[in-house]
UniProtKB/Swiss-Prot annotation:
The modification Phosphoserine is found at S102. This is Phosphoglucosamine mutase. It comes from Haemophilus influenzae (strain PittEE). Mg(2+) binds at S102, D241, D243, D245. InterPro entries: A-D-PHexomutase_a/b/a-I, A-D-PHexomutase_a/b/a-I/II/III, A-D-PHexomutase_a/b/a-II, A-D-PHexomutase_a/b/a-III, A-D-PHexomutase_C, A-D-PHexomutase_C_sf, A-D-PHexomutase_CS, Alpha-D-phosphohexomutase_SF. It catalyses: alpha-D-glucosamine 1-phosphate = D-glucosamine 6-phosphate. GO terms for biological process: carbohydrate metabolic process; peptidoglycan biosynthetic process; UDP-N-acetylglucosamine biosynthetic process. Binds 1 Mg(2+) ion per subunit. The keyword Cytoplasm does not apply.
Amino acid sequence: MANRKYFGTDGVRGKVGAYPITPDFALKLGWAAGKVLSSQGSKMVLIGKDTRISGYMLESALEAGLAAAGLSAAFTGPMPTPAIAYLTRTFRAEAGIVISASHNPYYDNGIKFFSAKGTKLPDEIEEAIEAMLEQPMDCVESAELGKASRINDAAGRYIEFCKGTFPAHLGLEGYKIVIDCANGATYHIAPNVFRELGAEVIEIGTDPNGLNINEKCGATDVTALQAKVVETKADVGLAYDGDGDRIMMVDHLGNKVDGDQILFIIAREALRSGQLKGGVVGTLMSNMSLEIALKMLGVPFLRANVGDRYVLEKMLENDWTLGGENSGHIIIADKNTTGDGIVASLAVLAAMAQHKLSLNELASAVKLFPQVLINVRFAGGENPLESDAVKSVAAEVEKRLEGKGRILLRKSGTEPLIRVMVECQDAELAQQCAEEIAEAVKKIN
């Protein structure tokens, strides 16, 4: 990934109107991807997007580039990222493209690709696309140009897929569920999934206008969801991010249940039913309490680098089927090929219904250690993490923690940030240590 010019850990991403998230680059990217992907197969690429206003501009440019390379485009309209992964497989498309910046504000956007198998593109394919971007753009003969079409039943297909992951002998009758769709791609999907399974659904964050995606709502800000769950005396709250590949939950008392706790609930239920294959993959950011709780069940646990693509890579390396991040990316590989917020939340609801336990009771096995995360904007130049001054402060902090906690310093793969994380059973000590390291990073920056 270090030598990439455009592709980060989750495709190409940035501020709309600033290179490379511009219409001219999207046109060239569509063409370059089309040239690389057109060697065989259906000659058709699915294009989905979230609800950002810039999605219209970018999908048109991508379609024109693909057509010039001889590939046809099939538009799904606003659709969760995991839906595109699923639909790419079922339509036997050459590839799938998602126009989204996930949990970022509306003024950011991104373009990411799925292979014909519904997985992130291999590194060598992304590298080939980057190499093609350096070539002058051409156009196939008129008779070979791609066409554009629309898939009108994409939402219905994905709704049925999601419902099919829920055990047939269970239902959600009697459950009151608040669903926050972040004014994003799940707004017309998630409420219907849970209603059709029998639940009473209360919606928030389901009125997208192109500018309000992830704005004080969704998986990155569950404050409104917590208030609505308590106000309506709901059994559970579900919060998805803008493109629907993350899930955060809220119990009936208004407590947040994060990705680590969700991952544990799903793992324990899979273990009980004999469906857990191998162990569980987390990340360097996974809370120590998750690892301890899984160890008590005898479940192996491995840490991958941060990013769902790295979680999936380690799952595939070990032939395991469950992994995720504390941010709410949960991959259940025997159900979908990427993080799927709706499918993951259905797995938790199935455990609640099966054992007649509340989310609070299910999540109580994982008592999260306080974790302090400080993001320091990185302007370029020397990487502060390579600085002797930062290394010295980090080493002193590690010594002070004396096995009671841990630190993690990393450069973001999707944003110009240095992430400082300190985890410790003593919350005050964690905060103090994180601030000391962040201050050292700022001085270098």
